[in-house]
Amino acid sequence: SGNFGEATLAPMFTKDYSNLGSSDCMKVIPDSTLAKNYSGYSSMLPADQYQSRLAVMKEDVNDTAHNYHHDKSLSYGSYTEQTGQMAGDCVDINTENPSVVKYLTDAYSKYLDMGVDAFRMDTEKHINRWTLNHAFFPVFNQYKNFHLFGEVCARYHGAYNEGGSSDSCFFYTWSETESAWQNNWSNSDWKSNYDNSVKHFQAHQNRSFDQTSDNVYLNGLSYHTPDYSKANGTSTIDFPMHWAFKNASAAFGAAKGEDSLYNDATWAVTYVDSHDYGPDGQEKTRYQGGASAWAENMDLMFTFRGIPCIYYGSEIEFKKDVPIDVGPNAPLDKTGRAYFGDHLEGSVTASDYGKYTASGTVASTLDAPLSKHLEKLNQIRRAVPALQKGQYTTDSNYVDGNMAYIRRYTNSSVDSLACVTISGDATFKGLPN
């Protein structure tokens, strides 16, 4: 949570919503731990106020319920990246505390009860997989037609992150299949859960993950029912593919190199840049490769395995080559996180999927070359089931080409096969009639 506490986990302030333009809108709660143990708070320097708030949230004497992790340091590639504080405004909630788990799952279940289709779990890497599999995912997996995918930040080339398997994208798609990590969550003892989460991270710091899956691959040219007996029902953002997106060919190679380690990479969310990072080599700015490269990137994301995700404005190369995040050192308008709403002014009336009339500035936005390209890709993907959820092959017995593949999806009423080449020539062989 933020470092000003949280209404239930660490109540410190009330807020006067009629006076949000002033720092005086924040009022210390009279009977709070902050008021009682740090009575001189209002006269402290800002740095001392910050330390006082942290002490309320992270010291044993104050946070007696252990609603927060009390670790004082964080080292990437070690278990402390899941128990430490990753930033000043990100105080680490104790996800191993059963009462905290109930509070969080009850809160997010309200969104699911309202019909939310999916969650993107931010900073999933900073929660242990054993914890998620025992305490969180079973709650959310009860909801039908709901998809949860997480951000496991892995700014590395290849499938493995700095902590080995433990903090790698593919790792978070699997259930606990080893007996040592099954049925040992405590509904009363947070310390037991904490200790187990640490041991779980340390036990999986290898770079030779011993589970693989063929769920994403065709068997020859035949689709087969995926085996989800070891899946945990969630997926992740494909960070290794993103990191390799200096061009589409490199991203394609990165994806193929990791796919057997996911339980099913068909569900991985693919993207080029975001509110945090661009690809390696241009990670501090929004993508700058140009319209032709963008078109090729989109071609790959919308026809290869995975669920494509486009950062707002990419369809007009909004803020290309502009620094994404410089903290408080520039107005948002000068960054890659700038407001995009000006480009959406006007009206849109849709008559069908991809069919619409528009007026005002939004009409120009929708008429941009990449917008039109994206519109057509969406229509193609929607019309071809194999491109939505099919398995794939790049086996040279069936396909030759730089970025070429075959995808197929079948069920009792559908047999959809797509031959795809992104750039350059390709040869397809042995296709069924």
Spell out what each predicted region is:
Residues V272-R286:
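Short, basic, glycine/proline-bearing loop/turn elements
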Residues D106-D264, A268, R286, G290-A291, ...:
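Active-site-proximal helices and loops of the catalytic beta/alpha 8
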Residues T64, S99-K102, T357:
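Long, compositionally biased low-complexity segments enriched in polar/charged residues
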